[in-house]
Amino acid sequence: MPTLEKTFELKQRGSTVRQEIIAGLTTFLAMVYSVIVVPNMLGAAGFPAESVFIATCLVAGLGSILIGLWANAPMAIGCAISLTAFTAFSLVIGQKVAIPVALGAVFLMGVVFTLISTTGIRAWILRNLPSNIAHGAGIGIGLFLLLIAANGVGLVVSNQAGLPVKLGDFTSFPVMMSLIGLALIIGLEKMKIKGGILWVIIAITIVGLIFDPNVKFGGEIFKMPTFGENSLFLQLDFMGALQPAILPVVFALVMTAVFDATGTIRAVAGQADLLDKDGQIINGGKALTSDSISSLFSGLFGTAPAAVYIESAAGTAAGGKTGITAIVVGVLFLLMLFFQPLAFLVPGYATAPALMYVGLLMLSNVSKLDFDDFVGAMSGLICAVFIVLTANIVTGIMLGFAALVIGRIVSGDIKRLNVGTVIIAIVLVAFYAGGWAI
């Protein structure tokens, strides 16, 4: 296949078509759980699950094919679990934002992220958004995911007196299945079993079919994809997303995307040996832009923001070095469109372990905090803690920025403050002080 070898630089990167196909299948198995988890999470917020399933498959399929063809990168794109949680539980449920407005915010985030990925604005933002705050946001979102998953199965429930939450019914079937599932995922991932998360979801679903009367198989396996009567396709309210109260949400989405995408893409590129002599990502600009364009797809199709999946590392570990890996992933997600009935068979307690596991992985950001910079590290932890305590990502980020600026001034370390950081902090605090934040 000389054309493929030349187009995707197979020989130059030390790979083969067969190796790339195996890598693509490996990545797909590692992240296909998203087409089950994302509709379940957004469905809890009132999104029509059938429409979200199709949109999620389309975003993952088209986004992965785009980054494979354009950036020649072995990275797969899908709806980010952390941003799905933010969209569903913080934005729509917690802050009562209408679903079309939420989709408008997702689309606007995609527009802004695309612009900053193709101009010098991204470099300015990266210079002025402290890494400790970014890592703190990652920790907070991880804790938020853990809380959402634990609450969803009844492990943690609201408390009528005293502290806000308490232990639920520990012996209930959903709780026991979730905890067993989490332990299984951790064990399988330790053993580097490909598709471990998916296999656990399937196993718990089968157990549910046998022992849980609420889980029923309708007899269908294949179904022609249709958005359904309650389709969210092109239902975004872009003008609604431009309201002052919604703009902090867009900022939070953009900030998370900037740091998460850059960190994930760099990590995967490093594993695939796709860094140049200066340590920069080969075709990094195209990869980041592909990532941001995929969030435009999300807003248009009606699902959560997109991002490069860290599970792409499973494929690069299997030998993926070119865009063929990503294209294989994209094609497989498009084929998933025809297996919709199987996705809706999965109970919430089967996907909860996956959410808990992703949340635990995000807590690894603690190791990235620079504790030699005491004020910065504490500001990052303030950001993390208040994201979960307020169930609001933007609030945590605002408090983190405010603590950083005030802490620098009080400690006499004002020289470490960038003008841009101060501007961002003032804008965020003003949004809250003015009552415009949601």
UniProtKB/Swiss-Prot annotation:
InterPro entries: Azg-like, NCS2. Its main location: membrane. One of its GO terms (molecular function) is ATP binding. Pfam families: Xan_ur_permease (PF00860). Keywords: ATP-binding, Cell membrane, Membrane, Nucleotide-binding, Transmembrane, Transmembrane helix, Transport. It is found in: Cell membrane. The chain crosses the membrane at residues 21-41, 51-71, 73-93, 97-117, 137-157, 167-187, 195-215, 238-258, 296-316, 326-346, 347-367, 386-406, 418-438. It is a multi-pass membrane protein. It comes from the Bacteria. GO terms for cellular component: plasma membrane. ATP binds at G315, T316, A317, A318, G319, G320, K321, T322. Belongs to the nucleobase:cation symporter-2 (NCS2) (TC 2.A.40) family. Azg-like subfamily. This is Putative permease HI_0125. It comes from Haemophilus influenzae (strain ATCC 51907 / DSM 11121 / KW20 / Rd).
